[in-house]
UniProtKB/Swiss-Prot annotation:
Region (Disordered): 41-62, 182-238
Official protein name in the record: Group 3 late-embryogenesis abundant protein, mitochondrial
Subcellular location(s) of the protein: Mitochondrion
Highest taxon of the lineage: Eukaryota
Composition bias, Basic and acidic residues: 182-200, 213-225
Any GO BP: response to desiccation
Main localisation: mitochondrion
Free-text domain note: Contiguous repeats of the 11-mer LEA motif is characteristic of group 3 LEA proteins and form an amphipathic helical structure under water-deficient conditions.
One GO cellular component, as annotated: mitochondrion
Keywords: Coiled coil, Mitochondrion, Repeat, Stress response
Residue stretches of each LEA 11-mer repeat repeat: 64-74, 89-99, 140-150, 151-161, 179-189, 190-200
Role summary: Mitochondrial heat soluble protein acting as a molecular shield in water-deficient condition.
UniProt source species: Hypsibius exemplaris (Freshwater tardigrade)
Taxonomic lineage of the native organism: Eukaryota, Metazoa, Ecdysozoa, Tardigrada, Eutardigrada
Coiled coil: 50-202
Length: 238
């Protein structure tokens, strides 16, 4: 009787293991109940003890089956969890690679833009240089034109002095006229040369300033681009 009650308690405790083990647990519980009833109705108790022992073995077998089922379910859950973790790791790795590729494209685009602007600044400087050279050519041309005018005036004076009936006073007056015209021509050339020189210096100054500003802007953009790339790499590593 005491043994049958212990079997009943073991069977009832095993009923809380897992949903998958419910059929075996119910069978063990029912067997224990019948064992109690049979033991209480038996006079000698020995047949009841034998039957209770057999039911105890059946209950133990059912408990083992239930434990095996629980272990199987636990392993399946563990395998699924491990698979989920691997999928999550793969997703994070793929995302990091995508971010890295995107950051590389952004950096390359920024680098191309900086190179294009640098080339543009270089072209501007070349244009300013050509313009300054053009100013110098204009100065030379103006000086040559003035010199030609002076030569023409001198030749005219020579002709007048050597002409028949030419007088000393006329020659003197002509010479004064030539000198005045030569001085006027020289002053005009000097004035034009000064203006052109100022313009050339202004052009060179503007081009140099523009080139310096472009270099500063390009350097700042390069630093900004490198900082952005560094931040993206840091986030991808995290």
């Amino acid at each position: 009787m005491f043994l049958a009650r212990n079997v009943s308690r073991v069977a009832l405790r095993s009923a809380s293991l897992s949903p998958a083990a419910i059929p075996q647990q119910q069978h063990a519980g029912v067997a224990a109940v019948y064992a109690v009833r049979f033991a209480s109705s038996s006079g000698s108790g020995r047949p009841a003890d034998n039957w209770a022992e057999s039911q105890k073995e059946k209950a133990k077998a059912g408990l083992k089956d239930a434990q095996a089922e629980v272990g199987k379910v636990a392993r399946e859950v563990k395998d699924k969890a491990a698979g989920g973790i691997e999928q999550a790791k793969d997703a994070v790795k793929q995302g990091a690679n995508d971010l890295k590729r995107s950051g590389s494209r952004t950096f390359e685009n920024a680098k191309d833009d900086i190179q294009a602007k640098a080339q543009h600044a270089k072209s501007d400087l070349k244009g300013a240089k050509h313009q300054a050279e053009g100013v110098v050519e204009n100065v030379k041309e103006a000086a040559e034109n003035a010199w030609e005018k002076t030569k023409d005036v001198a030749e005219n004076l020579k002709d007048k002095v050597q002409s028949p009936g030419g007088l000393a006073d006329k020659a003197a007056n002509a010479w004064e006229t030539v000198k005045d015209r030569a001085q006027d021509a020289a002053s005009e050339v000097k004035h034009k040369a000064g203006d052109l020189k100022d313009k050339a210096q202004q052009v060179i100054h503007d081009a140099t300033t523009q080139s310096g500003d472009n270099r500063k802007q390009d350097q700042q953009q390069r630093r900004d681009s490198q900082g952005s790339q560094s931040g993206q790499n840091s986030r991808s590593r995290n």
